Amino acid sequence: VDELEAVAGPLEGSKLAARIADATYAYERERYQEARRILRSLVESAPNSPAVRELNGLVLYRTGQWAAAAKELERYRELTGSYDQHPVLADSYRALRRYEEAEDLWQDLREASPSGDLVAEGRIVAAGSRADQGDLTGAINLLEKALRRVNHPQERHLRQWYALADLYERAGDLPRARDLFNRIASADPEAFDVRSRLRSLR
């Protein structure tokens, strides 16, 4: 609310805050077209609101509008200096085959290292980008840097292991893929589609 009041004034800011709450509610329930309708007017009313730009970028990303999503998330980055949406922005560039920009974002994120979760997501996107360009070895090497046994794996560990197992399978290294899918299943049998992936590797 404070942010919206700062960019639109107290009265208008309160109205905008209610509208962005509606858009957030729709987004969280995967009603992306509804969220998009609400956000169109918000972008016009509060173009310098980071919260509006961020949510609009995320909605556009979820609906596969990569160029528009990248534009919004770049604006969010300019307004805040935040690394929060670097992985999503990088994945948008990856979808657009703007691989150099995706790699630059990964390097920024890696050097800043704002949080383990963000760096993990950025690493997954960067590895995927390298794989998309035919560099499976480079993609695998990048994710192997995060391959260490932990007593209580968190979601970020499982996501990186899954991405790496998928790359092993694509590279034809089925024993390593199987081992890593088994490690994920041991930590969380319901994670992703790990059961069906293991069945397909028998």
Q: Could you tell me what each predicted segment is?
A:
Residues L79-S82, E111-A112, N141-R148, E169, ...:
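TPR/TPR-like (Sel1-like) alpha-helical repeat modules
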Residues G9-N48, E54-L55, Y61:
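Alpha-helical segment of the N-proximal tetratricopeptide repeat
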Residues V52, Q85-H86, Q160, V194:
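TPR alpha-solenoid repeat register
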